[in-house]
Amino acid sequence: MDIVSLKFIGIGFMAIGMYGAALGVSNIFSSLLSAIARNPSAAENLQRMALIGAGLAEAMGLFSFVIAMLLIFS
């Protein structure tokens, strides 16, 4: 295999990282909705923590995207 095909295989693996970030964010917000349904008085605190968690999960997806762009253009 040449280096170009290996670059594209690496980019495909980076897509798995983006998929994982999307799954993580969806799990965070589905858990948030069920937690708010169980305890509406704690909604403000739960929402703040969920947004922090979603930001961290989305950062992993952005890191995967940046690495994929570095692989494409290097």
Curated annotation (Swiss-Prot):
Keywords: ATP synthesis, Cell inner membrane, Cell membrane, CF(0), Hydrogen ion transport, Ion transport, Lipid-binding, Membrane, Transmembrane, Transmembrane helix, Transport. It is a multi-pass membrane protein. SUPFAM superfamilies: F1F0 ATP synthase subunit C (SSF81333). The keyword Membrane applies. It is found in: Cell inner membrane. The keyword Calcium does not apply. The record marks 58 as: Reversibly protonated during proton transport. It holds the Pfam family ATP-synt_C. Coiled coil: none annotated. GO terms for molecular function: lipid binding; proton-transporting ATP synthase activity, rotational mechanism. Gene3D superfamilies: F1F0 ATP synthase subunit C (1.20.20.10). It comes from the Bacteria. The chain crosses the membrane at residues 8-28, 52-72. GO terms for cellular component: plasma membrane; proton-transporting ATP synthase complex; proton-transporting two-sector ATPase complex, proton-transporting domain. PANTHER family: ATP SYNTHASE LIPID-BINDING PROTEIN, MITOCHONDRIAL, ATPASE PROTEIN 9. Belongs to the ATPase C chain family. F-type ATPases have 2 components, F(1) - the catalytic core - and F(0) - the membrane proton channel. F(1) has five subunits: alpha(3), beta(3), gamma(1), delta(1), epsilon(1). F(0) has three main subunits: a(1), b(2) and c(10-14). The alpha and beta chains form an alternating ring which encloses part of the gamma chain. F(1) is attached to F(0) by a central stalk formed by the gamma and epsilon chains, while a peripheral stalk is formed by the delta and b chains. F(1)F(0) ATP synthase produces ATP from ADP in the presence of a proton or sodium gradient. F-type ATPases consist of two structural domains, F(1) containing the extramembraneous catalytic core and F(0) containing the membrane proton channel, linked together by a central stalk and a peripheral stalk. During catalysis, ATP synthesis in the catalytic domain of F(1) is coupled via a rotary mechanism of the central stalk subunits to proton translocation. This is ATP synthase subunit c. The gene is atpE.
